């Protein structure tokens, strides 16, 4: 059996910085090869070399052969247009970079099918494989009308529409709830059995253990381990961080909040949600992709203006963002999942992080920069890395920079929407430890939105479960996770660990029960 792709002594250098140093790996038909490592370890740079692609200012050397074509040699990349899509399809970590915001998803999928494999059945097949409905209503929606997890699956459908021999998946479980993640494992196993070669880039060690035949562990651009799944590092345990609340009165409160995409003529996407966060407390919000978690976060941040009900901060009404005072903006900060688009590609990351302290707290440039560098270092982003433009940072590094940017406002409330999805266990532990310190020392209140039920249980003192925009269950995390009262929560808990039998693919929206109080 011939390999579909072989990478030999691949190196990537940007100026004097070595991004990848003599990396070797092979992709075989019907097998999953995994590249594993911390943010910035060289996973994405190595994978993009299969397409002959690289970041600005990066020089590639070594040998990359794909489908018996030389894509990279010691003189750098060669013409690789013939392998893109037809042989190698790449699904990026951040689906926003793969989706045209001005095109309905159906039109985009049909265009790809026309280029590679004409036929409407190709589009429907790709949607089914990506766990998405193929009805007209779905195909006519724009990318911004889907949740982050749903956009991830749309990007996967785009890659599958091309009918490639090799599928490169960069953090494919990012933003997926536990049920959909388990279904993804089953579908990728089926694709591999059909002969597709899969290159999996992931810090999700459970996903890698469930799928990979070969594992390559990267650290600082070098291969440190290679072999079967036995070479994977042990997971870092996140210790529970729930502390003592400081007061009985909520700091942030949402009362009877409903939201819709349009002012009239559209079913609400959030239905009469109540939420209260105490100083130093943390409310976790969980649910399947598209359940309304991000819409709730955007309402709290003032970004989603089409909502009804009341949102208060320390008992005072909070208007929408454009009507908030600078002090209100400072006190409530929002960090969302897809952060790359929020950074200016022309400016250094540390300067953009520091700007928050200058604008919202009045610090001078020198003090703001020193605080930015110190906060970034606490989160595992070195001063050397932070001095680069955003395009030269990995997804995990940029995610931590976005958190640091919000923290420099010294907020009273921090709304965190999937802020650890691009991080490995060690990076997640750094984030959790710093936020726990802020809760204890400053009384910072957190709203923590995540698909990682174990992490939610570790950081939260109260959990809301959303389904189809409604709170279907709530209570202490120990109770909700161990004695779930609704079928949805039971399915989420059962699916939280990869390797169990997948539950039925039927909609959860019809399994509602009264919320636990």
Locate predicted features.
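Helix-to-loop junction immediately C-terminal to a conserved catalytic motif
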Residues: 51, 301
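Conserved ABC transporter NBD signature motif
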Residues: 59-72, 225, 309-317
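ABC ATPase NBD coupling module
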Residues: 71-89, 115, 193, 267, ...
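Conserved ABC ATPase signature
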Residues: 142-146, 150, 389-393, 397
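Conserved catalytic motifs of ABC-family nucleotide-binding domains
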Residues: 163, 410
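ABC ATPase "signature
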Residues: 226-227, 474-475
């Amino acid at each position: 059996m011939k390999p579909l792709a072989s990478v030999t002594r691949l190196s990537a250098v940007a100026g004097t910085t070595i991004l990848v140093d003599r990396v070797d790996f092979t992709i075989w038909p019907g097998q999953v090869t995994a590249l594993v490592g911390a943010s910035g370890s060289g996973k994405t740079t190595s994978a993009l070399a299969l397409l002959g692609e690289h970041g600005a200012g990066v020089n590639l050397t070594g040998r990359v052969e794909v489908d018996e074509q030389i894509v990279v040699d010691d003189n750098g990349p060669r013409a690789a247009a013939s392998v893109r899509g037809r042989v190698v399809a790449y699904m990026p970590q951040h689906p926003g970079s793969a989706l045209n915001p001005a095109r309905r998803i159906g039109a985009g999928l049909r265009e790809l099918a026309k280029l590679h494999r004409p036929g409407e059945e190709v589009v429907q097949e790709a949607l089914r494989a990506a766990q998405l409905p193929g009805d007209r209503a779905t195909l006519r929606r724009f990318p911004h009308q889907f949740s982050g997890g749903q956009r991830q699956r749309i990007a996967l459908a785009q890659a599958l529409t091309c009918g490639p021999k090799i599928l490169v998946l960069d953090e494919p479980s990012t933003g997926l709830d536990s049920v959909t993640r388990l279904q993804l494992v089953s579908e990728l196993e089926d694709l591999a059995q059909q002969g597709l070669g899969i290159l999996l880039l992931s810090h999700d060690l459970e996903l890698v253990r469930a799928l990979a035949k070969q594992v390559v562990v990267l650290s600082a651009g070098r291969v440190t381990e290679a072999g079967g799944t036995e070479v994977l590092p042990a997971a870092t345990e996140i210790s529970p961080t729930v502390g003592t609340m400081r007061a009985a009165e909520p700091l942030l409160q949402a009362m009877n909040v409903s939201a819709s995409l349009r002012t009239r003529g559209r079913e609400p996407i959030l239905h009469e949600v109540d939420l209260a966060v105490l100083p130093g407390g943390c409310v976790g919000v969980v649910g399947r992709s598209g359940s309304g978690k991000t819409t709730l976060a955007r309402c709290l941040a003032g970004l989603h203006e089409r909502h009804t009900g009341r949102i208060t901060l320390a008992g005072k009404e909070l208007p929408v963002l454009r009507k908030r005072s600078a002090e209100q903006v400072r006190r409530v900060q929002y960090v969302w999942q897809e952060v790359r688009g929020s950074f200016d590609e022309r400016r250094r990351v540390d300067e953009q992080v520091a700007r928050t302290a200058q604008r919202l707290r009045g610090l001078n440039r020198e003090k703001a920069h020193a605080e930015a560098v110190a906060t970034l270092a606490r989160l595992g982003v070195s001063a050397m890395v932070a001095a680069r433009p955003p395009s030269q940072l990995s997804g995990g590094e940029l995610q931590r920079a976005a958190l640091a940017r919000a923290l420099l406002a010294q907020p009273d409330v921090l709304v965190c929407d999937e802020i650890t999805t691009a991080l490995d266990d060690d990076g997640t532990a750094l984030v959790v430890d710093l936020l726990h310190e802020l809760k204890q020392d400053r009384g910072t209140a957190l709203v923590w939105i995540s698909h990682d039920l174990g992490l939610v249980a570790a950081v939260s003192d109260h959990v809301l479960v959303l389904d189809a925009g409604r709170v279907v269950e709530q209570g202490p995390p120990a109770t909700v996770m161990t004695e779930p009262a609704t079928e949805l929560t039971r399915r989420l808990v059962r699916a939280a660990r990869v390797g169990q039998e997948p539950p039925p693919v039927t909609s959860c929206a019809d399994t509602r029960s009264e919320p636990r109080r």
